[in-house]
Curated annotation (Swiss-Prot):
Consists of three domains: the N-terminal catalytic domain, the editing domain and the C-terminal anticodon-binding domain. Catalyzes the attachment of proline to tRNA(Pro) in a two-step reaction: proline is first activated by ATP to form Pro-AMP and then transferred to the acceptor end of tRNA(Pro). As ProRS can inadvertently accommodate and process non-cognate amino acids such as alanine and cysteine, to avoid such errors it has two additional distinct editing activities against alanine. One activity is designated as 'pretransfer' editing and involves the tRNA(Pro)-independent hydrolysis of activated Ala-AMP. It comes from Wigglesworthia glossinidia brevipalpis. The keyword Thylakoid does not apply. InterPro entries: aa-tRNA-synt_IIb, aa-tRNA-synth_II, aa-tRNA-synth_II/BPL/LPL, Anticodon-bd, Anticodon-bd_dom_sf, Pro-tRNA-ligase_IIa, Pro-tRNA-synth_IIa_bac-type, Pro-tRNA-Synthase_IIa_type1. One of its GO terms (cellular component) is cytosol. This is Proline--tRNA ligase. Its EC number is 6.1.1.15. It is found in: Cytoplasm.
Amino acid sequence: MRTSQYYLATLKDSPSETEGISHRLMIRSGMIRKLSSGLYAWLPTGFRVLKKIENIIRHEMNKIGAIEILMPIIQPSLIWKNSGRYEEYGLELLKFYDRKKKQFVLAPTHEEVISKIILKEINFNKVFPINFYQIYSKFRDEARPRCGTMRSKEFVMKDSYSFHLNEKSLEKTYHIMQETYKKIFNRLNLDYFVIRAKTGKIGGFISHEFHAYYNKSDVLINSYKKIFDKNNIINKFKKKIEIKNLIEINAEDILLTSDLAKKFNIDIKQIIKILLVHSIEKNHPFIAIAIREDHEIDLQKVENLNQVKKPLKFANYYEINKYFKVKKSYLGPVNIKCLLIVDKEAHCIKNFVSGANINNKYFFNINWDRDVVSYLVYDLKLCRKKYNNKKNNNSIEIGHIFQLGDKYSKPLNYSLLKDYNKKKIFMGCYGIGISRLVSTYIEQNYDSNGIIWNEEIAPFKVAIIPININFSIKVKNFSEEIYYKLCNLKIDVLFYDNVERPGIMFSNIELIGIPHILIISDKNLKNSIIEYKNRITGDKLMINYKYIFDFLLQFNINFNF
């Protein structure tokens, strides 16, 4: 996509009535615009993000055999009266009459509709258990809409409904759905937790809520800004770390890092350990994971990597000895004979210690990009948090699952004849607030420049910023060539072909949060290089333009659903 053909809609400042960091950034980055209280239009950038989150959810739901359908948002009020929820919902349920004086409601949820339609059909087909889902708009007449799409009147939701002949079958699907929700939120890299919850207006007898942390108030947001600014000031005055020469140390029979640290007086945080997992590549059967010695890897994060074989499996002693010809304790990142993936916190360390891939030897003062040049960086660290079984004051509900029993099937008088005995129909329902997920993600992933999207849900995965495109034919032609090649590789790319000052282009691209940024300039092209910036890590690299596509493809940015 070219910016000259795209509605970027970014703003220098956010309107005064915005509430919370996500609301401000969504307005400023041109994702949404307010129509009325609690009602928002999704502009192109926001709509792209929304659709990518929908596709992740759709992919995970399809994997467990759920079937996608679509139901009307307008529902007869009679079915709500039959279920007993017409009065229970009160003013949140928007009611109206058609020209024939028949009353309808705008749906906040679809339990009544799915029960009426599907159970009547299944009465003849007898297909159990079965799980349906839809991704569609809902409406709730909120008394106090706030924080943009965090709490709005109209919102996009994934709601699903399962039907069963017994409670055991319902419990099994309920567990599968709970694990599926975890996979969805893990793919979004959300910081969330699960709690047992009240069933509320939906009803039923068991329910769990998924909550994500967010900055609940302007006071909290401002305090975060102060901390952020303070850290920036401190970093400016930190003494620059001297890069030391690489040293090979003979440490015979030291197999424990605790012994290594004690003998050489090393801080355990300066030691990098290597873990080996099985790869999907037959010719390259292993992947090395580099992480700080005092950290643990998150198994789910590692298994989610596209390069890793599923289910996750670690290399055993015999495989390590056969393939690498070295004991596990002496494995290290320097010249390792496989793909190397580095945890982002391990990547921040300078002058670290690790194995030399030779028995009884270690390297001291290893540095990334000098001693280790080929690797990928991901967030792989396990974050341990202690959560009370209570709603956290600074969290927001992003998902809710219920075991409903026969609450909806019983009032509608649906049962199934089987073996000449009437059987109850048991239901489960499962919801995810998709438009709320967008806001929640931003609350957890931003900096002073704007939003920080991960590759899967970013509106664009690559941005091309040509410097002085209106003055340099070489910059223009080369930028066009890069753009067409990326498009042919099916990569979402935004080509900033408007004539703007570099500062404005950088500001807009960082504001909307595109993960990979290519900067094309005359100065660099003379040296056959392109400047690359990673929006997620902040890393900057100079890359020979011959290898730019291979470099970008290592991030699997052409992988779409």
